[in-house]
Amino acid sequence: MDEASCRFPEWVSSKIIDYYAEQNIKALFDWQIDVLNEARQFEDQHLIFSAPTSAGKSIVAELLSWKVASTGRKVLFVLPYISVAREKLHQIQRCWRRDDISVCGFIGPQASNPNEWLGAVCTIEKAASLTNRALSEDWFEEIGMIVVDEMHMVFDSSRGAHIEHMLSKVLLWNQSALEKVRIIGMSATIPELYRIGKWLDGAKVFEARFRPIVLQNHIVIGSELRKSGDNKVLREFSEDPLILLTEESFRRNSQTLVMISSKLDAEKTALNIASRFHEINKTDSSLLEILKERANGLLFIKHGLERNGCKDRNVMSTLAWGVAYHHAGLTMEERECIELGFREKNIVILVATSTLASGVNLPAERVLIKAQPRGPSALTSLNYRQMVGRAGRTGHATRGETYLLIKKCDRDAVLKIIETPIDQGVLTRKRDAERTNLSRFILEGICTGLTTTRSQIHDLCKLLLFNSENLQLSDIAIEMLLRNSFISQDENDDQLSPTQLGRAAIASSLPPEASLAIFEDLNSASRAIALDTELHMLYLVTPINVSVWQECDWHHLFSIFSKLPSDHKRIAKLVGVSEKFILDQLQGRRNDKLLQIHIRFFSALALFDLISEMSIYEVSHKYRIPRGCLQTLQSQSATYAAMIVAFCLRLGWTYLKALLDGFATRLLFGVRSELSELVAIEGIDGQRARILHERGVTCLSHLSACDSSKLAHFLTLAVPYSSSNSNDGLGEWLFGEPRMRVDVAARTLKERARKVLIRRVQELGISVELPKFEENEENIQESCDSGLPDSCEGMEDELEEKENIVKMEEMTKSVTEMSLTDNTISFKSEDDLFKKEIKVEEDEVFIKKEIDEDEEEIVEETVIECLETSLLKLKASTDEVFLRRLSQTFSPIGRSRSILNNSLLEDSFDRPVPRSSIPILNFITPKRESPTPYFEDSFDRPIPGSLPISSSRRKSVLTNIANLDSSRRESINSNASDNNSFDVFVTPPTKSAKEEKRRIAVKHPRVGNIIYSPLTSSPVIKHPKLEINHFYLKDVCHDHNAWNLWTKSSTSTSSCSIRVSDDYTGIAIRTDAGNTFIPLLETFGGEPSPASKYFESFSKCIIPLNTRLEFLKTLAVTVEMYISSMEDAFLIFEKFGIKIFRLKVVRIAAYLNNVIDVEQEENSNFLPILMDRYSILDPEIRKTCSSSLHKAAVEVYSLKPIFEKMCCSGASLQLEMESCQTVLNIFYSGIVFDQALCNSFIYKIRKQIENLEENIWRLAYGKFNIHSSNEVANVLFYRLGLIYPETSGCKPKLRHLPTNKLILEQMNTQHPIVGKILEYRQIQHTLTQCLMPLAKFIGRIHCWFEMCTSTGRILTSVPNLQNVPKRISSDGMSARQLFIANSENLLIGADYKQLELRVLAHLSNDSNLVNLITSDRDLFEELSIQWNFPRDAVKQLCYGLIYGMGAKSLSELTRMSIEDAEKMLKAFFAMFPGVRSYINETKEKVCKEEPISTIIGRRTIIKASGIGEERARIERVAVNYTIQGSASEIFKTAIVDIESKIKEFGAQIVLTIHDEVLVECPEIHVAAASESIENCMQNALSHLLRVPMRVSMKTGRSWADLK
């Protein structure tokens, strides 16, 4: 290297320098340093620089752009070709992500939100479109730099206009912008370099001559070899110089590129070279020796081509000799295989068309150029320099040689071309209409708002590079745009504005002239479109000017046309295709006007076969189109389809847009429409989509409105059972995504569908913004009070207005047909037990509340009340809840479901339990005509949806209810304060005199079954009670006297309740001194809500924040504290530093009493449900809540009463409350976390991931998205042709084959890439799901815990430490090394040995199993010897049994045959018959709906609903409940005892994971503390157990070092 190298500038980040060092770039050249220094010195100027190929231009632009991106401004990289853009995207992403700078690609159909990236890599057209978008959407000022690679493309006759127009708009923007956009342009061959610099506002121009490897250029004229620029003949060839030069290259093992002008010539040349090598091999075996070195690589390439369906004999025959050809006639997959083979140096000679020189980065030591001075691909000066630049690239070759082969007759013409300066070559080249036609450029300027007058347009045109050519044409272009209604002009002034057609043209990236043709095409089609097949719609999205048919074989096309079905021929006639024209073509008669229509139709036929999932090779053979050209047609049509859809959308052609929407994706991927909408949602593959489709979830609206529990159930049907799912509650429920809970997966899918759905609806102009409910809360109240029809009037108008735009039925799954003429409203319950007809006036649509309250009916009152409550809750709900409740609130009249039975009441009442155990309390309503509503003897039949007293409460039951006379009815209200509570679900009484007169009547009493308490074994019967509410919220922080009085009174209280407000501004608290709200902000300006009879108006807080906090901290230590859930306790500590030491958790109590189901999404906000159930507060109070302050106060009021109503004495409740306090103390303690080591791990893992990526791509013969399961499946099963496991349970013919861990582990021996993908996924998962979330923690991690789980086990949640891996990679890194003890302390790890198995032994009382466990021998080892199976397989069986594993699952997990797995199962149950008996007994209880219980008596009833797999799953849940539940009770007892015993040693529990406890203890007390911990764990509930517990004790400095 003849130029000294220098280190990087000091302003470059060390992370970026490290990246380049890994790429073997450890220093910069002098010229690069000079450019960087000048660029930094003149930051306000644009920069244009030129340097030879391989001199290092890209790194200069990358460093400058990185500097801009690091300041938060966006950078655009503009590259000419998709292949080089993809390569640049991956490289920039790998580099910049080290500095946490996001980079995305605008290359294919994908797009990205501008808020999600700082760097964008674009093709030329995408960059032009992106800048238009930025200007239109007013975020252009966020762009700081535009880097144009291959700047010479600005002179290109077809695409250069895009660059010129884009940069001209930037120049105009910069004239008035405060923060300018900087332009960086570079290329090895920039014509008129200084002219470009002058054009770009006097940009700094830099031209370097340095090239690391000096080229040796040669010219071969005829058979004579000369050095370029020298007439001396160096050598004369006796045969074809090209063949001899390639043979010479092959013998010296030197890779060679041969550049040919045409595809046909490239194939012919490659075949000639291969034939030559074959002939030589007959007499000289030296070539064969060279090939032997590459035999494996060439064989691998051959297999790769075959797996991609390549049947081209020419490709295979040339490949056998290390020769290949590369042109656009090959498919993309074939080209990628060949490119990879050349990069890996397995292919020695590559013959390619000249487009490869600029489109693909494939350097070589020697480049041969076969000159063609004439024809469509004639050699140019610029093209020549691009091709010779491929020789001698740094890092790929040690020398560079070029040979230009010229026929003697073409000598003068070719020499003239290569000796012509590129500047002159550009100036003499003819420019096409795209360059001179300014209509598109001017229209873009007007649509983006850059120009609004003719003078501004002239100013913009002056900024063009070729302004002298264009200025005179600008007025002509403006007139054309005006004439064709693309723009309009104000009559009073010169203002120009875009029309709808103009905006549509720009939005769809269509030139104005093309827009007119497309407008006419679509307009005529919309009047007569055939919908019996997709062919006509596909024809409309097929490009008008199709150029993939090189030469049409009309004989063959006529044969195809004559065999078309009748519906296709009808469409052909509709679009203008005729048999007569084809016959005319056969006879040589031309008609150019109709030619394009016919070519377009046959192209549509080919595309129709492609989206019907016919292979590209079959379609290519059927229509005789080169497969590469067919792929080009497919890609162009996908792009064109997206443009057409955007065009229709902008024009407001909603129906046509709806018909054509989706074709872009289908054309791109070649799929049928059946599942396209569901598969478009991330996380859904073909298997999941088919299950959802079969269950009625056929579109996004169904998915978003589907009940979460149902959706979770569907996922369990779609995903094969795995034993790991039951251990921690996690599974691979979403395709290609990390393991998660099934309910989380269901909610995730709903959320994704909801977002897409709402975005689509909003795009149609229909507002679904929730704040409107919040802003008009009073109006909602009033409309609910006066009747719902008034509140819906506006909505009906809006729907009527939008009738011609969109169908709302599919969006909401609710707004369906409404009959406004029926004068009868019919209510039906689900089981159709009761019916009630209520007469209403003809103009009424919904149930109304009568003005005369004396004649109100309880059913109306209840419904209206529920509607009001639902609407009030609606304003604070998510959009998802909005969609669901909109559907349920405005249900159509006359449906088969009752309003009382739909989900309006789901927010107020628990999920019903089996009807067999539910006593029903029926509300009876007098006829509307009755003048005596309270004492009428004649009553209608009970209304449906009678409100049940749920047996899930397990507390009270209603027995022998007889008809009550008026006095008895009055006594119910008068006894509302009686201590003998009698729970009746009626509307709570209010202070209104009229409301006091209301009565209830009960008819046809039913006697309910006696229900046993979950905490005791005796039946519980209580009397109903209506609690009188005394609620008032007062402000004690506005005055010192009020504060002192309240604190003094509260200090003497024995208990209190607290609740964090939703906006975290403070805490609502209830003590004996009353209800109040304590703001915990430094400044609190008061609550603007007006005072009412329930809420005092809050004014500015004058009590110091420290005073407020100190009192609350003191109170939390001294009194018993009732809280809603553990999350509240965690929040109170994190937000305000308040610790609670005497805990009562309402959610735990509700769960123990089976009032809520922890698996149900609806129970996440359970307090309103419980408040309604136990009549804690008048709903009127909750309805008047106008802020989060009020809501918190209302909820805190209910905590203690709810807890006391639910709780009976019992060991289970006591244990849960004690363990909750212990877990809370663990949260307070936290565990020490080594953040520095974590960051070090992240850095190392990212390097490993990059290396793995390169290895995987190399093994796959091309790059692909490793994160995409679809692309992984495509590579494994199609590109590489691996065999899908037969035991996977999935049909190999499905489009999207699963590639989960289980499948890949079964395929691991087929190919090395499988193991690499598994390793990549494991490391990537550790990085993204473990290390990166943990990296933000400093000091100690205070982990949240989930106590309310279906099995009772304790789970970690925020952050989730449940699955911190023991080992990250093979070099010994472990994530558990990050969790350490403080200095002078050690960690003690105590882990139960076979806890679940020991519990099973106790519960089953199987003597053999009890004896084995009691003997303290290695159970698994002994069983392994007895059964002659591996120990690991035996262990899997024993634990799998607990989780309900069958023979098939066991065989998949242990990789044994199903027969062997069945033998193991039979051997296990034969040896331990008591286990089988216990499992059968538990299943029998489920069938009889009898309670099942844990060791200390926690009971529940699980109903065996469903058949087949669903029933088996429920039975497994029941068995799991008893075993896991009992295990959790042992573990909770142990940690409670441990906490009390280790205090004397100064030790504390810092973490619990599964059955393991981590204790941090001073090193001097480790031995004593370990002994105490072991005793506590071994003796936990030992008096109830038949088998002993055994514990593994370990100590160490970190979690990973425990020994």
Curated annotation (Swiss-Prot):
Domain Helicase ATP-binding span(s) in chain numbering: 38-208
SMART domains: DEXDc, HELICc, POLAc
Keyword annotations of the record: ATP-binding, DNA damage, DNA repair, DNA-directed DNA polymerase, Nucleotide-binding, Nucleotidyltransferase, Nucleus, Transferase
InterPro entries in the record: DEAD/DEAH_box_helicase_dom, DNA-dir_DNA_pol_A_CS, DNA-dir_DNA_pol_A_palm_dom, DNA/RNA_pol_sf, DNA_polymerase_A, Helicase_ATP-bd, Helicase_C-like, HTH_61
PROSITE patterns associated with the record: DNA_POLYMERASE_A (PS00447), HELICASE_ATP_BIND_1 (PS51192), HELICASE_CTER (PS51194)
Signal sequence region: none
Record-level GO cellular component terms: nucleus
Predominant place of localization: nucleus
Motif DEAH box: where in chain: 149-152
Reaction equation(s) it catalyzes: DNA(n) + a 2'-deoxyribonucleoside 5'-triphosphate = DNA(n+1) + diphosphate
Binding residues for ATP: A51, P52, T53, S54, A55, G56, K57, S58
Location in or out of the cell: Nucleus
Broad enzyme group: transferase
SUPFAM superfamilies, A to Z: DNA/RNA polymerases, P-loop containing nucleoside triphosphate hydrolases, Sec63 N-terminal domain-like
Domain Helicase C-terminal: 283-434
A molecular function GO annotation: DNA binding
GO BP annotation list: base-excision repair, gap-filling; cellular response to ionizing radiation; DNA-templated DNA replication; double-strand break repair via alternative nonhomologous end joining
Record-listed E.C. numbers: 2.7.7.7
Disruption phenotype: RNAi-mediated knockdown results in defective DNA damage-induced checkpoint activation as indicated by an increased number of apoptotic corpses and enlarged nuclei in the mitotic zone of the germline in response to DNA interstrand cross-linking agents such as nitrogen mustard.
Known role: DNA polymerase that promotes microhomology-mediated end-joining (MMEJ), an alternative non-homologous end-joining (NHEJ) machinery triggered in response to double-strand breaks in DNA. MMEJ is an error-prone repair pathway that produces deletions of sequences from the strand being repaired and promotes genomic rearrangements, such as telomere fusions. Required to prevent extensive loss of sequences near G-quadruplex (G4) DNA sites, which are prone to cause genome alterations, by generating deletions.
Family: Belongs to the DNA polymerase type-A family.
Name recorded for this polypeptide: DNA polymerase theta
Organism: Caenorhabditis elegans
